């Protein structure tokens, strides 16, 4: 039964169980603190994992959109979105610190492979945790673009409308595809608030939610700073409050070894789905890697249009570190940093709760070497498990996308199809959309191949050699594909394929057009794309066929392989 906002239990397990910023140790201290402590960038020392504060950016706001799926996840009545209480919540205004005091998380991170030091929530404030009374699921509610915090570094604490629209829509798109993700609850315009980026841009606030916002970077900072007790409290909090549901820590090792194995498992499951749907985060630093395996912090993200495994949507990623091809290995690299942070806790094995031994370990070169050796051995095994999960889950989903039984003999059909797409620079989303809406049994192989080519020709629409050779390659593939699917009934196979092959993909050119319209005060296209991103498998969304086909299938050279900056 759906509830009103006031009926949802409010909590803050994060601040109740973890060490605070030493300069703001309590809510009472926050009430008395100078603005320079709360909203001016500084280093937080002493193992503090958060700072109590309230959003500093105050402005009149306008609700642009809310997410029906997120409202449902919270167990709210949809009518609640029209109330003043909801619209104040999603911009972080009218906060009751005595009921639950907001906070900003402290974390660090490796960015493009280099240690970046303290990062943290530089423009994000966590307001509280809300629990769905029916499901018992707890969500930490954040507002992004809420003003400066101690973690803002050189930034202004604002989020521009452009990046806010991108994050909101990406959350909706990935959630609808079944890819583990943080969720957007709402997006609101801020009246009269602007920020200087490449140009002066209007600002917005995205209200977002997740069971936890802890990242590998949260562990990195405590490990680098040698804050072992803070690290232990963080790990125990994750084990007791964050990772309990669906825990896959295995049967070997102490609880911290199991934590590492579980985080690797969750991220492997997510990476497999990224690869199957061609999603790229664009900036997979350790501070953008969730311990829950959630896709998180959407900046220069993108979906593959042309199937180019070397593509990165981040134009600052000149060495292709975060390209589509490299994502599985980059997550392994990030997991290795989590293992490094936990090395003493994992390497202590069954003596991890013997505080006298832990003191000896911390100060003994020989014991530390043994701890490193053991942790390295554990990590090697976890990496093998991770790789197997990524590969198996990737093929399981790809089998569904092409409508084939999960049989190892069919893998060659998938690899050959992807190779054709790569060789002739063809469009991946359009290819799978065509396959799920057209049966090869309905026409001759060559005719089917020609129509498939026409659906996904992209960078070389007028190149006769590419057209002819790709049709020839497709004709050969379609013959084998027809043979593999001939025992299945067409209508049921296509119906199943349509459930996993989106009709609409959130391409970067679509986002550019949405943002261009929004920046002149027109939000009609934004609202249409909201609907399409949230329900990508539909045959129609009630708009004109011409407009829907344009948004779903347009794949001209100028609209393909668009890169973005990290500016937000």
Curated annotation (Swiss-Prot):
UniProt subcellular location: Mitochondrion
Catalytic activity entry: L-tyrosyl-[protein] + ATP = O-(5'-adenylyl)-L-tyrosyl-[protein] + diphosphate
Primary localization: mitochondrion
PTM notes: Forms probably one or more intrachain disulfide bridges.
Cofactors that this protein relies on: Mg(2+)
Entry EC number(s): 2.7.7.-
Coiled coil: none
Family according to the record: Belongs to the SELO family.
Task performed by this protein: Catalyzes the transfer of adenosine 5'-monophosphate (AMP) to Tyr residues of target mitochondrial proteins (AMPylation). Involved in redox homeostasis by regulating the cellular response to oxidative stress. Regulates protein S-glutathionylation levels possibly by AMPylation of deglutathionylation enzymes such as glutaredoxins.
Name by which UniProt lists this protein: Protein adenylyltransferase SelO, mitochondrial
Species of the source: Schizosaccharomyces pombe (strain 972 / ATCC 24843) (Fission yeast)
């Amino acid at each position: 039964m759906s509830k009103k906002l006031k009926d949802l239990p409010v909590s803050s397990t994060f601040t109740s169980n973890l060490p605070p910023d030493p300069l703001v140790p309590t809510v009472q201290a926050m009430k008395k603190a100078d603005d320079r402590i709360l909203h001016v960038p500084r280093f937080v020392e002493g193992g503090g994992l958060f700072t109590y504060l309230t959003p500093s950016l105050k402005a009149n706001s306008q609700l642009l959109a809310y997410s029906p799926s997120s409202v449902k996840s919270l167990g709210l009545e949809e009518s609640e979105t029209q109330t003043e209480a909801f619209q104040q919540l999603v911009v972080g205004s009218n906060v009751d610190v005595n009921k639950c005091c907001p906070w900003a998380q402290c974390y660090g991170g490796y960015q493009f492979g280099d240690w970046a030091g303290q990062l943290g929530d530089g423009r994000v404030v966590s307001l509280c945790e809300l629990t769905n009374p029916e499901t018992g699921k707890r969500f930490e509610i954040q507002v992004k673009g809420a003003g400066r915090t101690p973690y803002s570094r050189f930034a202004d604490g604002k989020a521009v409308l452009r990046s806010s629209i991108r994050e909101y829509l990406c959350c909706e798109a990935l959630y609808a595809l079944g890819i583990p993700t943080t969720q957007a609850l709402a997006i609101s315009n801020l009246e009269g608030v602007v920020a200087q980026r490449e140009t002066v841009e209007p600002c917005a606030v995205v209200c977002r939610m997740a069971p936890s916002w802890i990242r590998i970077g949260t562990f990195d900072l405590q490990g680098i700073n040698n804050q072992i007790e803070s690290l232990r409290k963080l790990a125990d909090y994750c084990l007791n409050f964050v990772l309990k549901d669906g825990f896959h820590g295995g049967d070997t090792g102490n609880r911290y070894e199991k934590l590492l194995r579980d985080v690797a498992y969750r991220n492997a499951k997510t990476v497999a789905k990224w690869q199957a749907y061609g999603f790229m985060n664009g900036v997979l630093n350790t501070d953008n890697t969730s311990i829950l395996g959630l896709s998180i912090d959407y900046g220069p993200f993108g979906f593959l249009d042309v199937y180019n495994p070397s593509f990165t949507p981040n134009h600052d990623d000149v060495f292709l570190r975060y390209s589509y091809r490299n994502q599985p290995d980059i997550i392994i690299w990030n997991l290795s940093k989590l293992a490094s942070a936990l090395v003493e806790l994992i390497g202590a094995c069954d003596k991890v709760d013997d505080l006298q031994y832990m003191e000896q370990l911390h100060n003994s070169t020989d014991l530390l070497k043994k701890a490193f050796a053991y942790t390295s051995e554990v990590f090697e095994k976890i990496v093998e498990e991770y790789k197997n999960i990524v590969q198996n889950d990737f093929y399981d989903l790809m089998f569904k996308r092409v409508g084939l039984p999960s049989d190892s003999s069919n893998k060659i059909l998938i690899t050959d199809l992807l190779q054709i797409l790569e060789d002739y620079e063809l469009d991946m989303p359009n290819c799978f959309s065509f396959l799920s809406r057209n049966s090869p049994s309905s026409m001759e192989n060559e005719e089917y191949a020609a129509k498939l080519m026409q659906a996904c020709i992209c960078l070389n629409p007028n190149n006769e050699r590419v057209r002819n050779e790709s049709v020839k390659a497709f004709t050969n593939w379609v013959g084998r594909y027809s043979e593999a699917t001939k025992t299945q009934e067409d209508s049921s196979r296509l119906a199943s394929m349509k459930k996993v092959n989106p009709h609409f993909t959130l391409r970067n050119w679509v986002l550019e057009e949405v943002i261009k319209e929004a920046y002149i005060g027109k939000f009609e296209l934004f609202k249409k794309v909201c609907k399409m991103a949230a329900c990508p498998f539909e045959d129609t969304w009630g708009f004109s066929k011409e407009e829907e086909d344009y948004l779903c299938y347009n794949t001209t050279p100028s609209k393909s392989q668009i890169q973005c900056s990290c500016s937000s």
